[in-house]
A protein has these predicted regions:
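A structural boundary/capping signal
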Residues: 2, 24-204
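Bacterial N-terminal signal peptides that target proteins for export
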Residues: 2-11
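General helical structural elements
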Residues: 10-12, 123-124
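Bacterial N-terminal signal peptides
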Residues: 11-20
């Protein structure tokens, strides 16, 4: 009887630990994943970044389904997103380098794409595949261009954004999604076919 009671207490304790983490992963919706199209133009900043860091851009990856996001993986996404957002101070490329479109791994300051690059590197170091860590170009509601990191998962595409400490499914943002890195080649970019659908869905 005492053993059974202890086992029951242990089960309740484990559920108390695991349940909030598991429940935090958003449930799939109609706009779970982006629909990508053909190969499109590579941002000039990424082109120049690839010339300096060829190893990050010459990986050709086998086409495969997006992996299932585990509670541990979900916790890592949230941790790294908020950690990088807190450690790096946002500044424009013009203010940092005196010119636009300089993509780099930031140390103290960086533009939006620099935040995305650092999150990509840190998640890859934790075991995420580069095929699922895709820098993405979007348009903000005010028309300004912006860059975020998209993470492909079986449960859908999630966005890590330097303007938001909350990791969200892409369809819960107010952005128009334009293009992103190809999952099959880290140096190629593909268009996003349903990038405007998410804006319509967010306004409903």
């Amino acid at each position: 009887m005492q053993y059974t009671l202890k086992a029951r207490h242990l089960a309740v304790f484990l559920l108390a630990i695991l349940a909030p983490t598991t429940a935090a992963i958003p449930a799939p919706q109609a706009l779970t994943s982006m629909v990508t199209g053909s190969v499109t133009s590579q941002p000039i900043g990424h082109y120049e970044f690839c010339r300096a860091f060829r190893a990050e851009c010459n990986q050709r990856l086998a086409s495969r389904p997006a992996p299932k996001l585990t509670p541990h993986g979900w916790a890592l996404l949230k941790k790294i997103n908020s950690s990088v957002n807190g450690r790096i101070h946002a500044m424009t490329d013009k203010d940092i380098y005196g010119r636009e479109e300089v993509w780099a791994h930031p140390k103290d300051v960086g533009d939006c794409e620099d935040f995305a690059l650092l999150k990509r590197r840190e998640l890859a170091a934790k075991g995420f595949s580069l095929a699922d860590l895709l820098i993405t170009v979007v348009r903000k509601p005010d028309g300004e261009g912006h860059a975020v990191l998209t993470v492909r998962t079986e449960q859908g595409d999630f966005v890590l954004d330097n303007l938001d400490n909350v990791v969200k499914p892409w369809y819960q943002t107010s952005y128009t999604f334009l293009k992103r890195q190809a999952s099959f080649n880290t140096g190629r970019w593909v268009s996003i076919e349903n990038g405007r659908d998410v804006v319509v869905g967010a306004l409903r």
